[in-house]
Amino acid sequence: MTFVGAALWSFLRYRPSRVAVRGPSMAPALLPGDWALIVSPRVYRPGDVVVVEHPGRPGYEMVKRLTAAPGERIGERVLGSDEWWVQGDFAHASTDSRQFGPVTREELKAKVVLVYWPASRRGRVTPIR
């Protein structure tokens, strides 16, 4: 496979898109005004930064960190087979699973992989566990 073929295959497989960061809930990893590249992975892992649909507001998407997967413990609770826990890195400015509870796999929309704008913040978004 040529480089162009490999690049095209990768592009089509992961369906990249972009997202604008609007609030401070993911600071310092992501800041208001950042533009990031997002992909649709086959697998999500705790530590990934994800675009998630708010469970109580259909169509409203947020950027959060995936902190626990099905079967993992959050405090006294063990997450069910289709329950994922998301939180903002800057807890005091975040509305997340601590307020609305776990989200489903269907509500996980994409994985944030890199910031491309502004140029001074360009770089990979690293999963943190």
Residue ranges and their predicted role:
Residues M1-R129:
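Extended hydrophobic leader/signal-anchor segments used for secretion and membrane insertion
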